[in-house]
A protein has these predicted regions:
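Conserved phosphate-binding catalytic cores of ATP/NTP-utilizing and phosphoryl-transfer enzymes
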Residues: 85-109
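A short glycine/serine-rich beta->alpha loop
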Residues: 16-22, 54-61, 132-136, 179-183
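Nucleotide and nucleotide-moiety/phosphate-recognizing core
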Residues: 43-48, 70-87, 94-96
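Active-site nucleophile and cofactor-binding loops and adjacent substrate-binding regions
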Residues: 55, 66, 82-89, 113-114, ...
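N-terminal beta-alpha supersecondary unit
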Residues: 1-58, 87, 91
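A short helix-loop
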Residues: 103-107, 112-114, 120-209
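Short Gly/Thr/Asp-enriched flexible loops that form oxyanion-binding sites at enzyme active sites
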Residues: 54-78, 97-98
Length: 211
């Protein structure tokens, strides 16, 4: 990997979550500067590219359209191949990028995708043959983290902040319901609702409970 540039979208912070329309607009503003910086950091020119890979999905439609349109236009102008990528599959294969990785993985293997939009257990037979054998039936774990964080008054994204606070706290002080789901699937909406009621009950008795 010669360069890896990320443009943060702080515009979502005051809304406590990703706003699709704002995300796509931010993509439009950032995509050219991000590509320019990636090329500069890699020490190459745009004419040195041999192919272009882009996220075909899944994701927010507006943001996908911005990225896809830019990638297709650049591919046509440079007359180089365009490679569509399912970014959830790419997450599972990302560890193959590192040649000096301490832990070597070979096929078949089980992978877990955990993100703001997905929670999946995936059986990977090879680079192109993958099967989801377990997934969330409602909210993803990342979504549950962010929504619970919003209830606590934490800024988006709340997940890392909740994790930090949890590591500093007493894990046995409170008990929450554990979802009962068949097979290898997950469910987090019940836990989120349980947490909401827990906060409402305790704040009713003590308005400084969260403090």
């Amino acid at each position: 990997v010669l360069s890896n540039i990320i443009a943060n979208q702080d515009v979502h912070e005051k809304y406590g979550g990703v706003v699709p329309e704002l995300a796509s607009r931010a993509h439009q503003v950032n995509i050219i500067p991000v590509v320019d910086m990636a090329l500069k950091n890699a020490g190459i020119s745009i004419k040195d590219l041999d192919a272009i890979a882009y996220t075909r999905g899944p994701g927010l439609l507006g943001s996908l359209l911005v990225g896809g349109s830019f990638a297709k236009s650049l591919s046509l102008s440079l007359n180089i191949p365009l490679i569509e990528v399912n970014h959830m599959q790419a997450h599972l294969l990302a560890h193959f990028i590192e040649d000096n990785c301490d832990v070597k993985t070979d096929f078949p293997f089980l992978g877990v995708n955990i993100s703001g939009g997905h929670t999946q257990i995936v059986y990977c037979r090879n680079y192109f043959d993958m099967e989801i054998i377990g997934e969330t039936l409602d909210d993803s774990i990342g979504e549950a983290f962010d929504k619970c964080g919003k209830m606590l008054g934490l800024k988006y994204p709340a997940g890392p902040k909740i994790n930090k606070l949890a590591n500093e706290g007493n894990e046995n002080k409170f008990n929450f319901s554990k979802p009962k789901v068949d097979g290898l699937n997950f469910s987090f909406s019940g836990l989120k609702t349980n947490f909401k009621r827990f906060l409402e009950k305790n704040l009713k008795n003590d308005k400084f409970f969260i403090e």
